[in-house]
Amino acid sequence: MLDIKWIRENAGVLDNALAKRGAEPLSASLIALDERRRTVLQSLQEMQSRRNAASKEIGAAMAQKNSELAEKLKAEVAELKDALPAAEEESRRMEAELTDILSRIPNVPLEDVPVGPDESGNVVKRLVGSKPTWNHKPLEHFEIGEGLGFMDFEGAARIAGSRFTILKGQLARLERALGQFMLDLHTQEHGYIEVQPPLLVRDDAMYGTGQLPKFAEDLFRTTDGRWLIPTAEVPLTNMVREQILEGEKLPLRFTALTPCFRSEAGSAGRDTRGMLRQHQFNKVELVSLTDAETSVDEHERMTACAEEVLKRLGLHYRVMTLCTGDMGFGARKTYDLEVWLPGQDAYREISSCSVCGDFQARRMNARYRSKEEKGTKFVHTLNGSGVAVGRALIAVIENYLNEDGSVSVPEVLVPYMGGLRRVEKAA
């Protein structure tokens, strides 16, 4: 969430940022609403101050045996007490109205983010590796998985409906191996702390990371009002909610392997076959909490950590800098890692790494204290996929497909597969 004081002082900057995101200017209406709010608040505070002063004056008048003045003051206090509830309610209403509008305004992009309307404006930052060259025909992951007998979409549909998958046998083991490999890499080499967070969270947690109130339709809600997490970013980032951290201990880096749940409300007709777009999928998440001075560098570091997964798996990919029109609601800058899928003859997103500045921290009231400075500041938050496990499985089986329909196991995963080097058709 943006700071209304910052908006008052940077109205043109906000409107320019909104224009880059394809949104209408809002600064004038926000500042006008804030002026009304502050006028109401000032009036309320003056009423409260006068009530308190008059109450003290009653005692002084009584001590001086000035009953006429005392009665007059009592009447004034009574009148103020009667008027205060309505004034307090009006102040709360205007505060809530302003907060609601602010909570729906996207973050301000960094200056070096390319301007564009949608994914067509994204820019290739770098290409890593090269596309595989084979003599045999590439296949899509669902053709390979069903051919091996380890991927069952019809069975999943009978149990849960569309956009679910049953993995069995060696493909289930391969997906588990991928997740374990990623966690080991991030915890043992990249300095992240492994966390097993709740998969159900409250409204305020979803609000803190920016999923609510704007994106409720993309989420699954339980009958008791909790939400299934769409990403472990939500619980990991909210671990510092309402906390004051010691600045000397920053950055904090957390990682988790969790199921993620998304309704895919806006994805009708897209990727209806296979595992690319599921209601439930596994993902390794990376979250960093740092300060303003180091958050941009931390973004580069986090992206490199996610890239290392793909490098060690021997996968060809590209890094995309997302443009203003394709960036997420809470992000100031985002890099997407897009892995090459031979079966689709296309690059597909497998990781998204974003720096959010203090946007989420303001919503969570997450701050830090430095020994060198007085007071507290909001932390800066970052999140990224390190990486999506299901999509990594897709990439591995499409890129490591053999002519006989079997799939070679990437060398880095062999120890996690008990020495198995090839996934072959179920007997």
Swiss-Prot record:
InterPro entries: aa-tRNA-synt_IIb, aa-tRNA-synth_II, aa-tRNA-synth_II/BPL/LPL, Ser-tRNA-ligase_type_1, Ser-tRNA-synth_1_N, SerRS_1_N_sf, SerRS_core, tRNA-bd_arm
Pfam families to which the protein is assigned, alphabetical: Seryl_tRNA_N (PF02403), tRNA-synt_2b (PF00587)
UniProt cross-references to SUPFAM superfamilies, sorted A to Z: Class II aaRS and biotin synthetases, tRNA-binding arm
The enzyme's E.C. designation: 6.1.1.11
Single biological process term from Gene Ontology: seryl-tRNA aminoacylation
GO MF annotation: an example: ATP binding
Amino-acid positions noted as binding L-serine in the UniProt annotation, renumbered to this chain: T231, A232, E233, E285, S385
EC category: ligase
Listed pathway(s): Aminoacyl-tRNA biosynthesis; selenocysteinyl-tRNA(Sec) biosynthesis; L-seryl-tRNA(Sec) from L-serine and tRNA(Sec): step 1/1
Location (main, coarse): cytoplasm
Binding of ATP, residues: R262, S263, E264, E349, I350, S351, S352
Cell compartments where the protein resides: Cytoplasm
Keyword terms of this UniProt record: Aminoacyl-tRNA synthetase, ATP-binding, Cytoplasm, Ligase, Nucleotide-binding, Protein biosynthesis
Family statement: Belongs to the class-II aminoacyl-tRNA synthetase family. Type-1 seryl-tRNA synthetase subfamily.
Task of the protein: Catalyzes the attachment of serine to tRNA(Ser). Is also able to aminoacylate tRNA(Sec) with serine, to form the misacylated tRNA L-seryl-tRNA(Sec), which will be further converted into selenocysteinyl-tRNA(Sec).
Name of the protein this chain belongs to: Serine--tRNA ligase
Gene (UniProt): serS
